[in-house]
Amino acid sequence: MGVPRPDGFFGNCDPKNKKNYRTRCSALIKIRNNMNILIDTAPDLRQQLLRHNIKNIDKVFYSHMHADQTHGINDLRSFYLKDKKQINIFADITTSKYLKKNFSYCFNSFSKEYPATLKLNLLKKKITINNNSNKITIRSLKVKHGKVDSTCFILNNKLAYISDISDFYKKDFKFFKNLDYFIIDCLWYEFHPSHFNLEKSLYYVKMFKPKKTILTNLSPVLDYKVLKKMLPKNVIPAHDGLTLNL
């Protein structure tokens, strides 16, 4: 949803605090030697790319098919126009079908003037990406997200990125224990059928014992400063532009 909402509603968030201005969730993985991997194409993607001066996108991983994860996809076209190279997209079967149905022009060449700009690849459980002497391993795991599944991503067995979740599958608990970083959905205080609330996020923080936790996907209900005061020392609210080093 972002903060403020399109109607200007800040909810409980103090508009004087810059960390309360939130775009929809996307994450950028920067690998040395200028490789950029994007997780999700939020509707605010153009704004995010310009703000952080991103000049290339090499690969995109999708967590699921919802609009707030996919509807910035058209902004990837600019990088094709610049480099004349299709961008590799990775998505599960459900998300792939949604993307091909709703954004077919991205994946099919209709004319010389409108070539396919993206190449769709089926998401595997584990992918290793090499960039000269640097490499990153991305493990993809399903989590519950209301009536559908979402995909979370674990980078080099150190960082988990889970933007949308209503619960974990118990069989995968072992992958989330003792991570360096645990980036987890936390919509608001009350129960929600498709997202974690604060209580549930902190329940799993206590169970998995990461070194540091970042709460993301925060609604206008959650003011940055108020929320931060409520949290344990190793848990912080996310904010736009937050950078972590692995």
Predicted regions, residues:
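Binuclear metal-ion centers of metallo-dependent hydrolases, dominated by the metallo-beta-lactamase
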Residues: Y169-L246
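Catalytic metal-binding/acid-base residues of hydrolase active sites
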Residues: D44, H66, S166, L187, ...
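Binuclear metal-dependent hydrolase catalytic cores
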Residues: M1-I162, K171, K228-L246
